[in-house]
Each structure stands twice: as C-alpha cells, then as structure tokens.
C-alpha cells in the first residue's frame, strides 16, 4: 500500500502545471459548469463578478438548469469551505479567476496550496484553463439546459427543493450548549448545589444542574456536593436518597465523575439514580485528539475561527477526552534575537493560546501543541548563516540541529511559550515525516532503514539517533523552563526499527512515546496478504511494531501512549465516525492487556463526540468494564428503547467492516467520494490526486490487489453491511423524541458508508470493463444505473446532515449538488453506451 509519505514523494516529482483540464460533456458549456459547481459554495455577487455579468443572470441560469433556490453563505461558512471551492474549480478556472472567486490575492492562494496540508499534492498538476465569461447561450445550449432541468426534476422531484442543513451546520450544533429534553412531567423540588470553594468546581456543578433542568424539565429532587480530597487517586461517587456526593483528588477527575452521572441519567432517562457507591481510577491519560472542524491554517492568529468552542469542549469531555491538540509553528510563537525575522504576531498568538487553555480547563481538558520542528527554510535564509544550513528537500534546507545555536533557539522558543502559557498540557512531535525539519526527516527509506542526512556536511557523518536525541532534549529542556509537569511526547511515525532503541536510551525518562497501535498488524483480505502501514479501524491493534516500541520505552524508563483512531480513518473519512464500536472496544481490550498508559485518539480526522468515543470511554478507568454491557448502556443512552436493535446493527457493521480490503491505495481510491465521483467513458489522462481527486485511476486505486478482488471485497462488505441498516432504522423509530435526531444522524452515517462501499465496487468494475475494451456494454449500463440510484439515495442523506462528506483538513469531499451532477453524468454515459 502506498503510504502518506511515499505518495507525497511521488506527487512532488510530478509537473505542477501544463496538464489538460478535464472537460465535462454533461454540461452544455463551461459557463453552465461554473454556475452549477459554485451554486452552493460561493455567493451570487462574487460569481457574477468573476463572470463579468449581473447577479440576475446567474440566478436565471441556475433556475433554468433546475438548481434549488440560491443560498447566501456567511463569512464563517466561506472560511470553512475554501478547499472545496478550489477543488471544484481546479479544472475550470485559470489562476486569476480562482483568486477572484475566493476573494483572495495570488500570494495567499499560492501559500495555501503549499502550506495547507500539502494541498497542491492533493489536487495534482495544475491544468491549463481558459477564462470563463458570461455569454448568451445558443439555441442548442438552451435546449440542453432545458434537458438538464427535466432530468433533475425526474430524478429528484420535490426532494431537490427541501432546504436541509446548511453547509458546516455542525459547527453551530457542536457549539450549542443546550441539552435536549429527554423526559418531562417529573415531579420534585429540583436540584441544588452545596457551596463549593473552588470556582471551577462551582461552575461545573452549575452546568450539571443546568443539564438536569433542561433534560428533565426541572424535575427530580437532589443535592449535589462536590469535594476535592488532597492525595485521593481517582474519584468516588456516593448516591443516596435525595443526594449525590462526588469526591476526587483533582478537578478534572471530579468532572469526569459528573459526566458519568449525566451518562447514566441519559441512559435511564431519569434524574433519579439507583443508590450506591462508585469508585474509579484513571488508567489512560492523556486522551487527546484534534478538532472536528479546525481550520488548518493559523487558528491562534484568527480567533474568530475558533477550533474549540466551549460547548464542543464540553461534548468532547463528556466523551472521555481530556486533551485537544493543534499545530504550533515555533517561528510564529516566539521572538528571537538570533533570528529577528521570527516571532511576528507571537504576542497575539500566545494571548489567544492562553485563553484557549483557560477555556479548555473549565471542562477538564488540556491543550497540546503539535510540533514539526525546526521548519526548513529557503536558501536565502542561510546566506549569512551557512553553518546552519542542513540537508535539502524540495528547494528548502534544514536548520541543522547539529548546530548548537539551532538547538538553543528551539529550547528558548519553547521556553518562551511555556513561560507565557505554563498551563499547557504539553507538546507532541513528529520528526520523520510531514514537513522537512531535521536533516534526517526525509532521509531515505522511511520507516524501514536508518535515515541518512543527505547533503548536510555535519549530520551526514552522524547517526540519526544521536542528532534526534539532542533535538528532543532541547525541546524537553525548553518545556521545563515554564512547566515541570507538561507532557513531552514523541510520535514514532516513520521511525525505523533500528533507530528506536538507541534513541530512547538517550532520552530523559520524563518524556513519553506514542506509537501507532495497529501498525504492522498482518492482514489477509480476499486472499491478499498485507500489513497495516497506515491508520485502520478494520484491522484491530496493537501490532508487533507498537508492542516492540512500547517495550523499548519501558526499558528506557519512559511511559507510553497508543496512537489510535476510534472514530474514522482514511478507510472512510467522509463520515464523522464509522459505527463499528465492537471493533473499537476490541481494540480497547487489547490495549488494556498491553499496558499502555495514554492515548492519542485521532489525527486530523476523528474529532467528533460520537457513540464510538462514548463506548471507548469505559476503558479509560478502572474497574475494567464488560464490553457487551458497555455497548448496551451506550445504545440506551443514544437510542433509548431501540437500544437492542442498535447494538445488533453495530455488530452487523463491525463484522462487515473487517472485509475492507486493507492494502488498497486508501489515499486515492474513491471511498471518500463514493457515488459523487464521476464516471468516465474516455480515460482522463490524470493520475489520482491524494484524497481529493480519485479520477478514473482504477489500477492505482487497487494498489497491490487485483482489481477483481477489490471489486469483490467492497461488494461483499456492502452486502454484509446492508442488514444492519434495517436494524438501525428500527432503533431510530423506537427512540424517544429527545434522542431521535442523534439516532437519525447515526442512521445517515451508516447509510453513507453503505452507499460509498457499494459505489467503489461499481466503479472498480466499470473501469475494469472499460480497460477490457468496453465489450460488455449491458453490464456497464447496469453499473451506470446502479451509480445513478446510489447518487439519488445519498442525496437526501447529504442534504439532511452537514457532517456528511466533510473532513477538517479537506473540507467537503462533495456537496449534495455533486450527487445531482452524478445523475447528469450517468445519463450522458448511458447515451454513449
């Protein structure tokens, strides 16, 4: 399987311009394509300005094609969908018009393409596009437009006019602190809070009382007492008639005990809980993940695009998460006398970081900075600093960490950050991937052999572990300048086995290691053998690589964390979570046996407060839970009376998902796009782009798998998944009103998985037949009709739930109108067949 770094290396070698744009024959002309593709992504006036016409003309053309009423997008929506806008126009507009459409300047576009999570590589080579201008349609084009409208009406009818959710509507939902009414008509005098000295505890207690009032109409009677007990490990909750007493040694532990009470009340749909005493001790900490909707750019400089609103932080905390991470770039966070060009805007960023840390702490959540440092610089940076110039990669050069002045800068910059914000939870680093950083970071056979430092005159003579140990110690010393307790965690992504032992032996024992749990687990699907080399939920960890690295960390006196994905992976990231909690809990049980001490629970995808996370939460504490009972309780909490059917559906989905043909090229296969990916009778001539453009590159999609096996496995997985949908439909129908919306969204997520899996099987078979000469045209027509049916079935799901098709670093893979376009595309293909 082509992993992330290998894919980026391949894409870096490809030309970035000069390729022919892909034409779309299902549109009468490029003007119609522009209006259609941007209808729900760009406001009318901006579209008109790009075309050189009036807003009225744009609206009339959209209506003539059968498009639904034009919406007005807010500034917040626009800042959250720019990747989708760029993608939709990559094969349509020249650079100047694309800049105008975004409302940016050319410098910002080029910076975004380069720095925004390798966006230029995801999009692929830049096509040559002629400007799109407003023109009067010919008689033939008007006739074709009328035909489009007829097809749209026939396929979607009144469904197309339903407003559904707004783009990125999930931001408002996750930012909403209100609790749904679960049950009314409960008598009682209400709940009260005993006086609390600690202000944070008092606010936590008031939030608990608000939850009871809103969830149960103010019913029930009780008095809540919150007590901090110095030296106490874990928490103790005592429930008696008319009172609840919660004791803990730390504020965060006490908050988790309160969240457990809320879970139990939601499960029982009652503010009155059975009497008893519950004692818990934390076994995994920290447990941190990324925001579901953070913008990848510079969130600390743009607080209006808040990646962690208060209500979202509370929802994550209720799901057992006690840490969140965001990227920090050292040369933007700290000034430097040695490098006066660094640190511009750092005061603003640190002020905003301090406020985020304060707000997160209100919910028992700590903030971690992801460091990929020191960032490589252009050659001009080293004109007066030749002694610092390290290995080269893609026209940039490392700030060589064998130079003591560079390490001093790293240390002092982190010291500046942690003195300014000592309450930070800590940092975690990636040192062998992503951006070019230390001289070894792109040094050859990644993850397999010991890296080399290439053309660095100093590091080329050194072992990688010696240079990295110096860098890691500088980082640790910088953190300790401001905090004695902040975590210093090193992520082993890309570390070769030979490097691990010597490196860890040189590190201080107060640093920690995080290892990808499922990495290198052997797997056989459809008769094809492979091993995990990316994130996976369908393959359950831990694997031999992680257990070796954890053992090496223990031998060096360090504690360890597991890097996991409990919500989703690139197996399918078009949904906020894959509803397979049985697999998640199997992973948790394995990790408990392995003795890990903390979790990194998500990379950029996977930050949604889901039923998967709620189920995993039971394993974060002692005593160890029972998996079956955990699933029943979470299902009752989320589905109410329909819980048994929900558990049965999850079991069906979990058993189906282990058929995923792991080892396919998950970065390019159209599992993220499903039925929105257009069919092509004629080869496009374009290689797939990472995540964003699968195109028609079927052989690339399949990786080492024969296409027939990929086709068969996706079809098998979809067929096995389908019975779970009927079970989940019953569970939703039985859910009480206060739980029905969340239950219905989970059904929409499950349907999306089914539609995407089946569509991938269709597309692989279609292109397999195309490559064989398109002689079996009856079967190809069947596949095209199946794709049309899947697009129609997915449309109301995507329209109703704004989470569908969205991922934080890629924005929307598709919008509802892309599914309507797929029907037009398929009708055109049928004409050719």
Locations of the language-model features?
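N-terminal export signals
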Residues: 6-21
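Alpha-helix capping and helix-loop boundary segments enriched in small/acidic/polar residues
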Residues: 73, 344-351, 397-408, 445-446, ...
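Short secondary-structure boundary/capping segments
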Residues: 116, 305-306, 340-343, 384-387, ...
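Secretory targeting signals
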Residues: 1-2
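Short, well-ordered secondary-structure micro-motifs within conserved domains or adaptor modules
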Residues: 219-234
């Amino acid at each position: 399987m082509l992993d992330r770094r290998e894919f980026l290396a391949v894409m870096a070698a490809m030309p970035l311009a000069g390729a022919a744009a892909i034409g779309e024959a299902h549109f009468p002309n490029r003007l119609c394509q522009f209006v259609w593709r941007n209808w729900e992504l760009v406001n009318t006036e901006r579209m008109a300005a790009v075309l050189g016409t009036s807003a009225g003309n744009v609206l009339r053309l959209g209506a003539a094609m059968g498009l639904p009423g034009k919406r007005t997008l807010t500034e917040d929506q626009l800042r959250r969908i720019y990747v989708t806008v760029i993608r939709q126009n990559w094969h349509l507009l020249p650079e100047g018009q694309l800049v105008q459409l975004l409302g940016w300047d050319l410098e910002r576009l080029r910076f975004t393409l380069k720095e925004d999570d390798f966006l230029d590589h995801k999009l692929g080579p830049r096509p040559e596009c002629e400007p799109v201008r407003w023109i009067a349609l010919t008689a033939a084009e008007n006739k074709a437009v009328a035909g489009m409208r007829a097809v749209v009406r026939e396929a979607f009818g009144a469904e197309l006019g339903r407003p559904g959710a707004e783009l990125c509507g999930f931001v408002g939902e996750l930012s909403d602190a209100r609790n749904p009414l679960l049950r009314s008509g409960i008598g009682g005098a209400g709940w009260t809070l005993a006086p609390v000295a600690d202000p944070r505890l008092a606010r936590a207690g008031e939030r608990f009382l608000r939850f009871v009032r809103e969830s149960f109409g103010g019913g029930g009677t009780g008095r809540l007492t919150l007590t901090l007990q110095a030296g106490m490990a874990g928490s103790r909750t005592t429930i008696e008639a008319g009172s609840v007493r919660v004791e803990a040694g730390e504020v965060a532990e006490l908050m988790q005990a309160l969240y457990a009470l809320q879970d139990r009340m939601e499960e029982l749909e009652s503010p009155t809980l059975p009497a008893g005493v519950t004692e818990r001790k934390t076994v995994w900490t920290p447990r941190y993940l990324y925001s579901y909707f953070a913008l990848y750019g510079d969130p600390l400089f743009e607080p209006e695009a808040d990646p962690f609103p208060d209500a979202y932080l509370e929802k994550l905390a209720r799901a057992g998460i006690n840490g969140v991470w965001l990227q920090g770039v050292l040369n933007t966070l700290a000034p430097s006398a040695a490098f006066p060009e660094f640190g511009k805007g750092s005061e603003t960023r640190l002020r905003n970081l301090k406020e985020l840390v304060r707000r997160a702490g209100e919910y028992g959540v700590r903030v971690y900075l992801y460091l990929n440092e020191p960032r490589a610089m252009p050659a001009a940076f080293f004109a007066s600093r030749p002694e610092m110039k390290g290995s080269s990669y893609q026209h940039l050069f490392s700030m060589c960490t064998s130079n003591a002045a560079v390490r001093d800068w790293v240390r002092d910059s982190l010291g500046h950050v942690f003195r300014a914000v000592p309450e930070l939870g800590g940092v975690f680093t990636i040192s062998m991937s992503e951006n070019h950083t230390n001289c070894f970071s792109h040094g050859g056979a990644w993850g397999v052999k010991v890296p080399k430092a290439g053309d660095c005159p100093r590091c080329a003579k050194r072992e990688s572990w010696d240079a990295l140990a110096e860098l890691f110690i500088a980082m640790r010393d910088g953190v300790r300048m401001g905090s004695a307790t902040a975590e210093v965690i090193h992520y082993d992504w890309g570390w070769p086995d030979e490097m691990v032992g010597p490196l860890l032996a040189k590190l201080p024992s107060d640093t920690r290691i995080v290892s990808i749990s499922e990495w290198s687990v052997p797997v056989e699907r459809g008769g094809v053998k492979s091993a995990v080399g990316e994130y996976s939920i369908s393959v359950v960890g831990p694997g031999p690589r992680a257990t070796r690295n954890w053992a090496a960390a223990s031998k060096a006196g360090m504690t360890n964390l597991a890097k996991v994905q409990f919500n989703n992976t690139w197996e399918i990231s078009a949904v906020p979570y894959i509803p397979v909690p049985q697999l998640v809990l199997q992973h948790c049980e394995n990790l408990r046996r392995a003795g890990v001490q903390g979790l990194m629970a998500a990379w950029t995808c996977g930050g949604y407060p889901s039923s998967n996370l709620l189920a995993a939460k039971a394993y974060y504490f002692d005593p160890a839970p029972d998996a079956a009972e955990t699933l029943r309780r979470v299902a009752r909490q989320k589905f109410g009376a329909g819980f048994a059917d929900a558990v049965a559906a999850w079991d069906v989905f979990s058993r189906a998902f282990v058929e995923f043909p792991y080892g396919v090229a998950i970065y390019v296969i159209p599992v993220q796009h499903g039925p929105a990916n257009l069919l092509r009778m004629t080869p496009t001539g374009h290689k797939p782009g990472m995540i964003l453009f699968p195109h028609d590159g079927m052989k690339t999609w399949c990786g080492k798998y024969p296409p027939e096996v990929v086709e068969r496995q996706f079809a098998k997985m979809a067929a096995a998944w389908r019975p779970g949908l009927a079970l989940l439909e019953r569970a939703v129908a039985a859910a009480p009103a206060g739980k029905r919306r969340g239950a219905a969204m989970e059904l929409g997520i499950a349907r999306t998985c089914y539609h995407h899996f089946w569509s991938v099987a269709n597309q692989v078979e279609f292109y397999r037949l195309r490559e064989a000469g398109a002689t079996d045209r009856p079967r190809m027509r069947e596949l095209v009709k199946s794709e049309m049916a899947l697009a129609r079935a997915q449309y109301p799901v995507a329209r109703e739930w704004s989470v569908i098709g969205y991922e934080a670093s890629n924005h929307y893979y598709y919008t509802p109108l892309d599914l309507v376009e797929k029907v037009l595309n398929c009708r055109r293909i049928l004409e050719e067949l």
